[in-house]
Curated annotation (Swiss-Prot):
<protein>
    <recommendedName>
        <fullName>UDP-3-O-(3-hydroxymyristoyl)glucosamine N-acyltransferase</fullName>
        <ecNumber>2.3.1.191</ecNumber>
    </recommendedName>
</protein>
<keyword id="KW-0677">Repeat</keyword>
<dbReference type="InterPro" id="IPR020573">
    <property type="entry name" value="UDP_GlcNAc_AcTrfase_non-rep"/>
</dbReference>
<dbReference type="InterPro" id="IPR001451">
    <property type="entry name" value="Hexapep"/>
</dbReference>
<dbReference type="GO" id="GO:0009245">
    <property type="term" value="P:lipid A biosynthetic process"/>
</dbReference>
<dbReference type="InterPro" id="IPR018357">
    <property type="entry name" value="Hexapep_transf_CS"/>
</dbReference>
<feature type="active site" description="Proton acceptor">
    <location>
        <position position="240"/>
    </location>
</feature>
<comment type="function">
    <text>Catalyzes the N-acylation of UDP-3-O-(hydroxytetradecanoyl)glucosamine using 3-hydroxytetradecanoyl-ACP as the acyl donor. Is involved in the biosynthesis of lipid A, a phosphorylated glycolipid that anchors the lipopolysaccharide to the outer membrane of the cell.</text>
</comment>
<keyword id="KW-0444">Lipid biosynthesis</keyword>
<dbReference type="InterPro" id="IPR007691">
    <property type="entry name" value="LpxD"/>
</dbReference>
<comment type="pathway">
    <text>Glycolipid biosynthesis; lipid IV(A) biosynthesis; lipid IV(A) from (3R)-3-hydroxytetradecanoyl-[acyl-carrier-protein] and UDP-N-acetyl-alpha-D-glucosamine: step 3/6.</text>
</comment>
<comment type="similarity">
    <text>Belongs to the transferase hexapeptide repeat family. LpxD subfamily.</text>
</comment>
<keyword id="KW-0443">Lipid metabolism</keyword>
<keyword id="KW-0441">Lipid A biosynthesis</keyword>
<dbReference type="Pfam" id="PF00132">
    <property type="entry name" value="Hexapep"/>
</dbReference>
<dbReference type="GO" id="GO:0103118">
    <property type="term" value="F:UDP-3-O-(R-3-hydroxymyristoyl)-glucosamine N-acyltransferase activity"/>
</dbReference>
<dbReference type="GO" id="GO:0016020">
    <property type="term" value="C:membrane"/>
</dbReference>
Length: 369
């Protein structure tokens, strides 16, 4: 059932200045193009203000400089995009698990469950688990031995949390993710791979969100650590012993090899690959499809991906790259020949001056000058 909130209540909740009918009931947040009666939309960029003329929304979130272009009720704020996010949170009617425990779940008798915990169908909770207040665990999740889950954390369906993992407060883990599986640790002996026991765990801070089908491996000896406020997209691989600093964002498909240390407030673009045993300092942005092979010690933006181009142009570029060493050798040969030529010209010039008797005359005038 849709949530209904009056415009005046929305204004009070987000600290907006209201213009128009305060009693309008808002049920949905929509784009300017698709908004209908009862919907609220937002104008983030003044370039799109002309779209307000045909907008059917009941209200618009916008900044003061765009108010005169709005023909319906408005909520005026300094940051329309941030205000839209707050309104969307208030109007979010996504189905959530209630504070009850389904009888089909299997919960070990010595596990500890806090107040208002919700457990969905076919959840398995093994021994020694500590689940704090207001935690919700959707259907099909498996929680291994001695796991700790902090207040208000939400696990969507079919999440697997291996033994000993610690998850902080108010985290969200989307469906299909696996936390605490063995890291890829082996030693080769006489041509045979021998498995190295992964004795560490995974430690996740507070307010962390992990997307669907992401895997975070447990440490070999020390823990794999995810800092507070980290956001990780879908289908990422975080290998053993990795440490990710607080408020770092990692887009979909990123692969982080073992023992990487990533600083605070970094942004890792989609499908990037980070080599093992390196360090990335705070406030580094790595653009999509990049391959990071060595440590980064200075904050900034780094890239190595190849942008798309027409196939014929790409084939020419690839062919040129294959010839780069021979081209470099030719350039060096040409430089050597040019330098040799100028040397011969200069020596010849002075020889001619000496033979013609002009050199003493030139020297005399230079000295007089």
């Amino acid at each position: 059932m849709a949530v209904k909130i009056s415009l005046v209540d929305l204004a009070q909740n987000i600290g907006a200045e209201l213009h128009g009918d305060k009693n309008i009931l808002i049920t949905h947040v929509s784009s300017i193009k698709n908004a209908q009666v009862g919907h609220i939309t937002f104008l983030k960029n003044s370039r799109f203000r002309e779209q307000l003329k045909s907008c059917a929304a009941s209200a618009v979130i916008l900044s003061q400089d765009n108010l005169s272009f709005c023909r319906v009720s408005a909520l005026v704020v300094k940051n329309p995009y941030l205000a839209y996010v707050k309104v969307a949170q208030l109007l979010d009617s996504s189905p959530k698990l209630n504070a009850n425990i389904k009888s089909q779940s299997v919960i070990h008798s010595n596990s500890i469950l806090g107040k208002d915990v919700g457990i969905g169908y076919n959840v398995i909770i093994e021994s020694g688990v500590i689940i704090s207040d207001n935690v919700k665990i959707e259907s099909g999740c498996i929680i291994g031995k001695n796991v700790k889950i902090g207040i208000g954390t939400y696990l969507w369906s079919n999440v697997t949390v291996y033994h000993g993992v610690e998850i902080g407060e108010y985290c969200i883990i989307q469906s299909g993710s696996i936390i605490g599986s063995d890291g890829f640790g082996y030693i080769k002996n006489d041509g045979v791979w021998i498995k190295i026991p992964q004795l560490g765990k995974v430690s996740i801070g507070n307010n962390v969100e992990i997307g669907s089908c992401t895997t975070i491996d447990r440490g070999t000896l020390d823990d794999t650590c995810i800092g507070d406020g980290v956001i990780i997209d879908n289908q990422c691989q975080i290998a053993h012993n990795v440490a990710i600093g607080s408020h770092t964002a990692i887009a979909g498909g990123v692969i982080i090899a073992g023992s990487v240390v990533i600083g605070k407030s970094c942004m890792i673009g989609g499908a990037s690959v980070i080599n093992g045993h390196i360090r990335i300092c705070d406030k580094v942005t790595i653009t999509g499809m990049s391959m990071v092979m060595k440590s980064i010690t200075t904050s900034g933006i780094y890239s190595s991906g190849i942008p798309v181009q027409p196939n014929f142009a790409w084939r020419r570029t690839a062919a040129l790259v294959m010839r780069i060493h021979s081209i470099d050798k030719r350039i060096k040969d040409i430089e050597q020949k040019v330098n040799c030529f100028f040397y011969i010209v200069i020596v010849g010039f002075f020889i001619v001056l000496g033979l013609t008797g002009l050199f003493p005359l030139i020297y005399f005038f230079v000295k007089q000058g």
